[in-house]
Design a protein with these regions (language model features):
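Active-site neighborhoods and metal-handling regions in enzymes and metal-associated proteins
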Residues: 1-269
């Protein structure tokens, strides 16, 4: 995403945090709906009900014509899966990406769920390492000089786990739009990246695969799949940077429970 980086006031960040906790609740409902025999449309409906009940709106529905409230991507589907009649089975990996808007301010977050709670050791390791990569990136943001410091932290975890970030798919700025400058790659890039500064709100979202980093888009013009059919995991949080620290906008505790192991204490905006 190119363009000017939108810097937020702390008051605006607080509205984004309201959107963020609605997204967190919607994803909790989606997680509970990821059971064997459920359709991906059922997962979407569970999240949509929470957003509607909270009086927020979906930022995915109608986005460039996207037909649902969430992206539900199963196994070899990396991101942007369209919810429908696909039936979930035990051992499936399901990533659910969801967003909400409150007073014009956006939240965006994603989780990966193992249907039925158990999967192969390789799949469990994939899901856990992708989650770890996200939190390593968030922790790095607390002290980062440039966006590239965040990218390096994410890629380091991926490398350790022998996983590959999907080429060309990156995190992004978020605020009055769901996708804004700057890009937040999940891998090191050449050249100088933007400097991290107070007022930035960023959606970090590692998308890691076991096999090749190459992807393709299906005929529905949305669903991104790994070219070799290997499974993928995807985790995402929206994070605010202000003068006194960082705050995970899509976690009710600001990310405190997960940042503790990194020695980072989030500070509310």
């Amino acid at each position: 995403v190119s363009g000017r980086i939108e810097l937020k006031t702390r008051e605006q960040m607080r509205v984004m945090a309201r959107a963020g906790v609605i997204v967190e609740r919607a994803l909790a409902a989606a997680r509970a709906a990821c059971v064997p025999g459920a359709r991906t449309a059922d997962v979407d409906a569970a999240a949509a009900a929470v957003i509607a009940e909270a009086g927020a709106t979906s930022n995915f529905l109608g986005y460039h014509g996207f037909p649902a409230t969430t992206c539900v991507s199963v196994n070899e589907e990396v991101v942007h899966g369209i919810p429908g009649d696909r039936v979930l089975a035990a051992g499936d990996l399901v990533s659910v990406d969801c967003g909400a808007v409150v007073e014009g301010w956006h939240g965006d977050s994603a989780i990966t769920v193992i249907v039925g709670g158990d999967a192969s050791r390789q799949d469990r390791a994939l899901v856990a390492a992708t989650d770890r990569a996200l939190w390593a990136g968030i922790a790095a943001l607390a002290t980062a000089d440039r966006i590239s410091d965040v990218s390096a932290a994410i890629e380091e975890v991926a490398d350790e786990a022998r996983l590959h970030p999907i080429d060309g798919y990156v995190g992004h700025g978020i605020g009055t739009q769901m996708h804004q400058a700057p890009d937040v790659p999940n891998y090191r890039t050449r050249g100088r990246s933007p400097r991290v500064r107070p007022g930035m709100c960023l959606a970090l979202e590692p998308m890691l695969v076991i096999g090749t980093d190459e992807s393709a888009i299906l005929n529905d013009e949305w669903t991104v799949v790994s070219v070799d059919g290997s499974r993928a995991a995807h985790w995402e949080h929206s994070v605010a940077v202000h003068e006194d620290g960082i705050w995970v906008l899509t976690a009710a505790d600001g990310g405190a429970s997960r940042l503790a192991e990194h020695g980072v204490v989030p500070v509310a905006p």
